[in-house]
């Protein structure tokens, strides 16, 4: 079965488990993808950024983890597309991933010695 012309895919609330396949990018005509409110795990495949026609994305309320991929269409979605995935990080979510630029704040000054924490 070929799904090349598929424009909208809504599989929300289906108790789906496992990972999102990288082959999702083969759905090049997809405008809307809703996989919310399932039990999907693992990372979001970077190949999803190759779906240039994507104008709606909801991956919220799953168990996704890792850094949100960046690129073309993915940069246009806000945090609601990814919310309630506690182990997901990166733009546009407020929680940064390990390895992202961190800053030091001085929390205590003992003479010339600074003790800091990372944000």
What residue ranges belong to the model's regions?
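Membrane-proximal ectodomain caps of single-pass cell-surface receptors
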Residues: 1-119
């Amino acid at each position: 079965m070929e799904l090349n012309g598929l424009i909208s895919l809504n599989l929300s609330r289906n108790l789906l488990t496992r990972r999102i396949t990288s082959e999702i990018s083969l759905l090049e005509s997809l405008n809307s993808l809703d996989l919310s409110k399932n039990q999907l795990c693992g990372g979001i495949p970077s190949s999803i950024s190759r779906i240039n026609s994507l104008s709606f994305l909801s991956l919220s309320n799953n168990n996704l983890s890792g850094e949100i991929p960046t690129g073309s269409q993915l940069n246009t979605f806000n945090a609601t597309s990814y919310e309630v995935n506690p182990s997901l990080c990166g733009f546009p979510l407020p929680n940064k991933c390990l390895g992202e630029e961190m800053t030091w704040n001085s929390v205590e000054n003992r003479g010339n010695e600074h003790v800091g924490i990372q944000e």
